[in-house]
A protein has these predicted regions:
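Structural signature of hydrophobic alpha-helical transmembrane segments
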Residues: 47-64
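Membrane-helix boundary/juxtamembrane motif in polytopic membrane proteins
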Residues: 143-166, 187-189, 215-236
Length: 290
């Protein structure tokens, strides 16, 4: 008979030795369980929409919306507000696109980005006012029911939903500035950099804030090993995106050459510092455990 300790060791070794394919599958499954699935069709629309491409972009977004909705139901997951909105919005957009004349289609192609972001803002803000923040539907499927109505759980979801609402509003305002004030829907800053940065900040905040709340609670309960993540843990990972932003700035002449180079240098430098700090932390933890 194999003792339980040996079995645990084998299980842990197997977990550490997971194949890249298995790790990729687990990562994909984790994404399916989060709000990113509800936002993915909107990202597809933002990436592919443009003059003469609205029909294709809306069609791809609608197909992805239906796919995620069906997969959720097959996996036994509940219907999500954002998932239903995706199907309704992009289905309606397809119908409207076909019934509009050329002038109407041109207007829609100009303003669809702002319409989409304002719609998302209203959904996020409305869900808060309705006391059912849209992220809570995803979070409830990741924790036991006994925690659903605890102040900490509710506060985390209100704050995270608020962060997404702010990101959608920033993106909408940036797009409006590009279209209505600069009269340039292809402006790299208002059309891409600012809007993408807002979404990335909200996504990183979604990962960072629950850890902060959990660690703060552990500190209050007297756990000497608990450490509350600082602002560096929030902003640090975002530096990864400075490199592609710098490259795109240079490639598309989106600003002074020095600015694009500065983005790349700061991004690479920050990533190097973060990796060095992680290695130092791992070494310290290994010494402490040995």
């Amino acid at each position: 008979m194999v003792d339980s300790g040996s079995q645990n060791d084998v299980t842990e070794d197997a977990g550490r030795a997971r194949s890249p394919a298995r790790r990729a599958f687990d990562a994909f499954a984790a994404l399916l369980d989060g709000p990113l699935t509800g936002l993915a069709p909107w990202i597809v629309l933002a990436v592919f929409e443009g003059p003469g491409r609205l029909e294709e972009a809306a069609g791809a977004a609608l197909a992805l919306s239906v796919l995620f909705l069906v997969v959720d139901r097959i996996r036994g997951r509940s219907l999500k507000l954002l998932g239903v909105l995706d199907v309704v919005f992009f289905g309606t957009l397809m119908v409207v696109h076909f019934v509009l004349d050329d002038a109407g289609q041109e207007w829609m192609e100009t303003w669809i980005g702002e319409i989409a972001n304002i719609t998302l803002f209203l959904v996020a803000a409305g869900s808060i006012l309705a006391r059912v923040p849209f992220t809570i539907q995803y979070a409830r499927e990741e924790v036991d029911e006994e925690y659903w109505h605890t102040p900490r759980f509710l506060r985390v979801n209100y704050v995270i939903t608020g962060a997404w609402a702010l990101a959608f509003l920033v993106a909408a305002v940036a797009g409006f500035v590009g279209d209505a004030i600069l009269h340039d829907s292809d402006d790299i800053w208002t059309g891409w950099v600012i809007q993408t940065a807002a979404m990335l900040c909200a996504l990183q905040f979604t990962q960072w804030y629950p850890d902060v709340v959990e660690a703060a609670a552990a500190v209050e309960e007297g756990d000497p090993t608990a450490t509350v993540p600082g602002i560096a843990e929030l902003l640090g990972p975002l530096a990864t995106w400075l490199v592609p932003i710098g490259i795109i700035t240079l490639a598309m002449d989106g600003g002074p050459t020095w600015l694009g180079i500065a983005f790349i240098v700061v991004g690479i430098g920050t990533n190097s510092v973060l990796r060095r700090n992680e290695q130092t932390t791992d070494t310290t933890e290994e010494k402490a455990s040995s």
